[in-house]
């Protein structure tokens, strides 16, 4: 396991255990961290679902936001930035008990903006569940 992966695991432990919104991600497991790429997994549980028993769109958006931000922290600059724009395209449902893989890529990082893409896929079938794009302002 790389030191980057180990360091990020420690950050995630703290983030997901303190009071606040990030606790909704406490079931997310970090698989690997590399410069500009992060892979996580999560088993869909009842607490993650909408009334139809599928992964809630709001949680999907939170995964896009948080996992892409952590991927940005794995770059040389290491700045998490603040969100400027985010969009998510929902393509297929994820049901209770299904394992999903969340893969974030940093597409470009400039002086003030960074651009990321995030794919959520079914771990068993590889089917694309959702795809997100996230633009972050990095400051001056």
Curated annotation (Swiss-Prot):
The tissues where this chain's protein is expressed are given as: Highly expressed in the kidney and moderately in the heart, liver, brain, small and large intestine. Also expressed in brown adipose tissue.
Q: Answer yes or no on keyword Mitochondrion.
A: yes
Q: Any one Gene Ontology biological process term?
A: negative regulation of cold-induced thermogenesis
Class of enzymatic activity (EC top level): hydrolase
Kindly state which keywords UniProt assigns to this record, in alphabetical order. Acetylation, Cytoplasm, Cytoskeleton, Hydrolase, Lipid metabolism, Mitochondrion, Nucleus
Phenotype upon knockout is:
No visible phenotype until 7 weeks of age. Animals are viable and fertile. After 7 weeks, mutant mice exhibit a modest decrease in body weight and decreased adiposity, compared to wild-type animals, despite increased food consumption. They tend to show a reduced hepatic fatty acyl-CoA thioesterase activity, leading to alterations in fatty acid metabolism and improved glucose homeostasis. When fed a high-fat diet, mutant livers are protected against steatosis and increased hepatic glucose production.
Q: Which residues carry this modification: N6-acetyllysine?
A: 27, 37, 43, 108, 127
Function, as annotated: Catalyzes the hydrolysis of acyl-CoAs into free fatty acids and coenzyme A (CoASH), regulating their respective intracellular levels. Has acyl-CoA thioesterase activity towards medium (C12) and long-chain (C18) fatty acyl-CoA substrates. Can also hydrolyze 3-hydroxyphenylacetyl-CoA and 3,4-dihydroxyphenylacetyl-CoA (in vitro). May play a role in controlling adaptive thermogenesis.
UniProt protein name: Acyl-coenzyme A thioesterase 13
Q: Which organism is it from?
A: Mus musculus (Mouse)
What is the phylogenetic placement of the source species in the record?
Answer: Eukaryota, Metazoa, Chordata, Craniata, Vertebrata
């Amino acid at each position: 396991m790389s030191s980057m992966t180990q360091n990020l695991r420690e950050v995630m432990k703290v983030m997901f255990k303190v009071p606040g919104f990030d606790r909704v991600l406490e079931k997310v497991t970090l698989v690997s961290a590399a410069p500009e790429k992060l892979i996580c997994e999560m088993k869909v549980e009842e607490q993650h679902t909408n009334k139809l028993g599928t992964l809630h769109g709001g949680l999907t958006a939170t995964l896009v936001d948080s996992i892409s931000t952590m991927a940005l922290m794995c770059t040389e600059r290491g700045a998490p930035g603040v969100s400027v724009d985010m969009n998510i395209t929902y393509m297929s449902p994820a049901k209770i008990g299904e394992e999903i893989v969340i893969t974030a890529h940093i597409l470009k990082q400039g002086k003030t903006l960074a651009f990321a893409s995030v794919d959520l896929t079914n771990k068993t079938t590889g089917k694309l569940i959702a795809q997100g794009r996230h633009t972050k302002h990095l400051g001056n």
